[in-house]
């Protein structure tokens, strides 16, 4: 594989992640965040994608100290957006997993709708062939991130 093109692709991927995140946070209607912070919304999104997760793993995903996650979880628990699930392997509190509640999923539906509405004008004029390519590339990357077959 051409090293220069690979470097260009990786740099573009990182830039799209950063610029896309900034764009979405700037464009999303503030009403979506009237009850929770952006960091709490990101935590809910992680739980939706990953399923029941330990606080330590959540800290790793958000690249913050466990105390920051504890504070976020406390607020989300008080609002009924997450709940503790017992880990089947162990019985102490340290082994409990946090899970999203139906109320938390409802907040995420509002957030997903706001993200869609913010990004739609940017993507709406991309032709079908390029859109198919984007979906195909993201599907391959997602599979590779999860340790799947590279030839999918």
UniProtKB/Swiss-Prot annotation:
One GO molecular-function entry: DNA-binding transcription factor activity
Pfam family, one: MarR
Residue ranges of the annotated DNA-binding region, renumbered to this chain: 55-78
Coiled coil: none
Keyword Transcription regulation found: yes
Any single GO BP term: regulation of DNA-templated transcription
PANTHER family listed in its UniProt record: TRANSCRIPTIONAL REGULATOR, MARR FAMILY, TRANSCRIPTIONAL REGULATORY PROTEIN
Protein name: Uncharacterized HTH-type transcriptional regulator YdgG
Organism field: Bacillus subtilis (strain 168)
Gene: ydgG
């Amino acid at each position: 594989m051409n090293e220069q093109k690979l470097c260009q692709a990786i740099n573009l991927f990182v830039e799209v992640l950063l610029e896309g995140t900034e764009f979405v946070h700037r464009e999303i209607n503030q009403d979506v965040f009237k009850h929770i912070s952006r960091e709490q919304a990101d935590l809910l999104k992680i739980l939706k994608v990953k399923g029941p997760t330990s606080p330590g793993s959540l800290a790793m995903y958000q690249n913050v100290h466990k105390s920051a996650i504890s504070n976020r979880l406390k607020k989300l628990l008080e609002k009924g957006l997450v709940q503790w699930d017992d880990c089947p392997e162990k019985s102490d509190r340290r082994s409990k997993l946090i899970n999203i509640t139906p109320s938390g999923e409802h907040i995420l539906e509002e957030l997903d709708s706001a993200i869609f509405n913010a990004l739609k004008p940017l993507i709406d004029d991309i032709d079908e062939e390029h859109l198919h390519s984007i979906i195909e590339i993201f599907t391959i990357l997602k599979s590779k991130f999860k340790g799947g077959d590279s030839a999918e």
